[in-house]
Each structure stands twice: as structure tokens, then as C-alpha cells.
Amino acid sequence: MTIKHLVISGGGPIMIQILGAIQHLETNKIVDMKNIESIYGTSAGAIVGVLICLKFDWETINDYIIKRPWQDVFPIKVQNIFDAYTKKGIFDIKTIEKCFKPLLDAKDISMNVNLEDFYKLSNIELHLYSFEINEYKVHDISYLTHPKLSLMSAIQMTCGLPILVTPVCIDNKCYIDGGMACNYPLNYCIESGKQPDEILGFKNKYIDEKENVNSDSTILDFLLSFLFKAVFSVNTDHNQQQIKHEIICDSHYLSFDIFKKTLSNVEVRRDLFKNGIETAIKFIEQYLKIE
């Protein structure tokens, strides 16, 4: 069966593991990016989807993600924290633009490209998931639902982890990180009519205990801990349909310390990439048994 659709979980640094896994699968002819028709992603998973839609060679993407000094793009300064009071987040759309500008420039794509035009360039149906807090529900953000929305705003909407990234407020709606209620949008993919056997999913499995807040915790540790526990209180795993092709990515709970280490340490990013390859190797062993 040909894989035509990807469903990719959010989870911060997990995106580097998923990139490693996808590349190993394509190298071993389990999946061919030329056959991908649609991608469903939340938060970091949405970023992976955008990278795939840009259609760079893997070496270019790897160098960009692993070797770029990301601590310069996401500086943690006292002023940023003070500014967050009025901006509702430490990082805003300017940071999102810094992340993607070199890539879009290399493809001669405008920073203001909207979802409709981005679809015409990639010919891949990209669905990003965001949580709207006023109506308190998940929104599918794509060229079908928001054709004139800029790609940068769409990324901010799905990656707007409260406090860290400013929410997007438009049309009396306030959009934050889709992982708050839909970290793995598998059901949305299936319900849109996609054949389950043509879907490849990348799903998180957390392998460590959630860190408790204590007297040494920072305000960001406190907030991230609260957000993760809020997410798991509305865990939808038991409602998700089962698919034949699903890669389980072992992951650590996101803490501010892990966030900083991933941004600042090339070796940490390399290890995450290698972990993704190892995950893909295990999947291939099982895949060959059932195909």
C-alpha cells in the first residue's frame, strides 16, 4: 500500500526525531515524499509538515535544523519576559519569521505567502491544528478553511504554547497551540475521507515521569508543568482510531530546561535525530512482517 498521508504529533523537540525517522523510511523505500498528498500536524508536527512542503533535499533540512544556532533566534532575556505581559507571550510572529525566512528566501517564496498560494506551490494539502480559547474548540487551519491566511500566522496559531509564544487574535478569536486538545490529529485525517491504510502516523509516547513543581522551579517550569497536566487531563488517545502504519516516538515531557538544551546544544539535536532513525528501524522490522 502506498503511503499518501502523514499525521504528525506535536511535542517540541520531537520534531527532530520525526525528521530522522521520515528520512530513514524514505531511504528504505517505505515512503516516498513524491506520493504525499496531505499532511495533518499540530505544533512541532506542523513545522515538520511545512518543511516537507518546501521540498528541500534532506541534507539541506538537516543542516538547517541541527546546525543553526537556535539560541540566537529564541533569546531568553529579562526584557522578553517583561514584554510578555502585554504581548501575551515571550516570542511572537517575528520569531516565527526568523525561523523560516532563510528557507523561504532560498525558494524565492514571499514571507507573506498565504495558505492558498503555498498549496499551489507544494501541491500538498497541509492541515494545521489550533485551539481557539473563546469558543474552546479545535480549528483545522488549511487552504480550504483559511485560504488568505498567511503561512507565518498559521504556524504561530498551531505553535502558540501559552506564555512562550503569543496567541493569534483575529476576528474575535484567540488561537493557541493545538496540542492543548489535539496533539495527534489522526481522527481528523480519517474523518476527512482518507484511507486508513494509506496513512502513516507519528505519535508520541512519554517515557518519563512528569516533573513536579517545587521550590526550585521557575515560573516557566510551573506554567509548562500546568499546561502538560491540563493536556493530559483531556487526553484523547482512547478515542483515536487504529491504523496499520504508526510510529511511536519515545519522548520526554517538555520542560523549560529541555527546551533550552535543545535550542543551544547541537549534540542534543543530533541525538534526537539518531533516536528518530532508531525508531524508524524498529518500525521497518514490523512493517516488513505485515506487508
Functional labels for PLM-detected ranges:
Residues 1-42, 47-291:
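Patatin-like phospholipase
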